[in-house]
Curated annotation (Swiss-Prot):
InterPro entries: Anion-transp_ATPase-like_dom (IPR025723), ATPase_ArsA/GET3 (IPR016300), ATPase_ArsA/GET3_euk (IPR027542), P-loop_NTPase (IPR027417). The active site is at D57. Pfam families: ArsA_ATPase (PF02374). This is ATPase GET3. ATP binds at K26, G27, G28, V29, G30, K31, T32, T33, E241, N268, P310, L311, L312. HAMAP family: Asna1_Get3. The lineage of its organism: Eukaryota, Fungi, Dikarya, Ascomycota, Saccharomycotina. GO terms for molecular function: ATP binding; ATP hydrolysis activity; metal ion binding. It is an enzyme of class 3 (hydrolase). Keywords: ATP-binding, Cytoplasm, Endoplasmic reticulum, Golgi apparatus, Hydrolase, Metal-binding, Nucleotide-binding, Transport, Zinc. The gene is GET3. Belongs to the arsA ATPase family. It comes from Debaryomyces hansenii (strain ATCC 36239 / CBS 767 / BCRC 21394 / JCM 1990 / NBRC 0083 / IGC 2968). Zn(2+) binds at C280, C283.
Length: 348
């Protein structure tokens, strides 16, 4: 039976139980614009709920997309009071982490402390680990808010992630299982090297390992939530070119191996030059190429929501421009009826 899904993200925007939405893909395909557009539509559709958009990409673009400065703490978007944004700063997070670790040992000459500092600074994927810690923090906050009335804290209905390019994102999503293995090795070390560690670290190592056990429980809960399609989904973003299509397929296969829900693909920068009296020969030639790969995507991902977004005449910056552009996530772009919007955005 041929079941063609709607070419929109309406099922995600209207979904009532989603807690986590990841937006990812190859570099330069419009992930930030797409994640910002999804966040804007969620905020517009549910004005009584609070939403948070987090950038985990070391090269942050959220501030540029909204024309508003964001930092490591959540800040409300001007013009959308129920949407907040934050950009995770790995250096600041690492500094906070080292300060927290120093409470267990104040001796600056301690060789164990020096060794741990060197290790954390050189571990591959430390940026992804720090981003994951931010996820753990929000999990913990949700638990507190669900357990008690705290009028000063904000409970976010859904958290949207503007992720780094594919490789970083896949490492980020591997962290739950990786951390469980790492924590298991730390447990083994505590048993074998316990007496020596106590001599070197002033007897505070037991507190550290107890803290790691608590982290392990939270990691397991995150893993459960990330693999629950009622709570988490992943939106793939690409452009209609061979390399982007190839990387999208690779990413989808990886996500499926992690048991993550992925059934939506946003294709950006489409020219829709067919039958356009204003298109040039170069546009027509490029649209012909785009259409070839669009047809391939239609066959390959017939059971996915395949959303086709137009290439506009200027940059999509600011809340008002994002509102105009993001409506095509819910209503398919019509080249004839909607062509005016291509040049109708406010320049920032």
């Amino acid at each position: 039976m041929d079941l063609e899904l709607e070419p929109t993200l309406e099922s995600i925007v209207q979904h009532d139980s989603l807690k986590w939405i990841f937006v990812g893909g190859k570099g330069g395909v419009g992930k930030t614009t797409t994640s910002s557009s999804v966040a804007v539509q969620l905020a517009l559709a549910q004005p009584n709920e609070q939403f948070l958009l987090i950038s985990t990409d070391p090269a942050h673009n959220l501030s540029d997309a909204f024309c508003q400065k964001f930092g490591k703490d959540a800040r409300k978007v001007e013009g959308l009071p129920n949407l907040s944004c934050m950009e995770i700063d790995p250096e600041a997070a690492m500094s906070d982490l080292q300060q927290q670790a120093s409470q267990y040992n104040n001796d600056p000459n301690d060789p164990l402390k020096s060794m741990m500092s060197d290790m954390t600074g050189s571990i591959p994927g430390i940026d992804e680990a720090l981003s994951f810690m931010e996820v753990l923090k929000h999990i913990k906050n949700q638990k507190v808010l669900e357990g008690e009335d705290n009028s000063n804290a904000i409970s976010y209905k859904t958290i949207i992630f503007d992720t780094a390019p594919t490789g970083h994102t896949l490492r980020f999503l591997q962290l739950p299982s990786t951390l469980e293995k790492l924590l298991s090795k730390f447990k083994d070390l505590s048993g074998k090297l316990g007496p020596m560690l106590s001599m070197m670290g002033g007897g505070q190592q037991q507190d550290i390992f107890e803290k790691l056990n608590e982290v392990q429980k939270n990691v397991s809960e995150v893993n459960e939530q990330f693999t629950n399609p009622e709570l988490t989904t992943f939106i793939c973003v690409c452009i209609s070119e061979f390399l982007s299509l190839y990387e999208t397929e690779r990413m989808i296969q990886e996500l499926m191996s992690y048991n993550m829900d992925v059934n939506s693909i946003v294709v950006n920068q489409l020219l829709f030059a067919e039958g356009d009296d204003h298109s040039c020969k170069r546009c027509e030639s490029r649209w012909k190429m785009q259409k070839k790969y669009l047809d391939q995507m239609g066959e390959l991902y017939e059971d996915y929501h395949l959303v086709k977004m137009p290439l506009l005449g200027c940059e999509i910056r600011g809340v008002e421009n994002l509102k105009k552009f993001s409506k095509f996530l819910l209503k398919p772009y019509d080249p004839k009826a909607d062509s005016d919007i291509v040049f109708d955005l406010e320049e920032k």
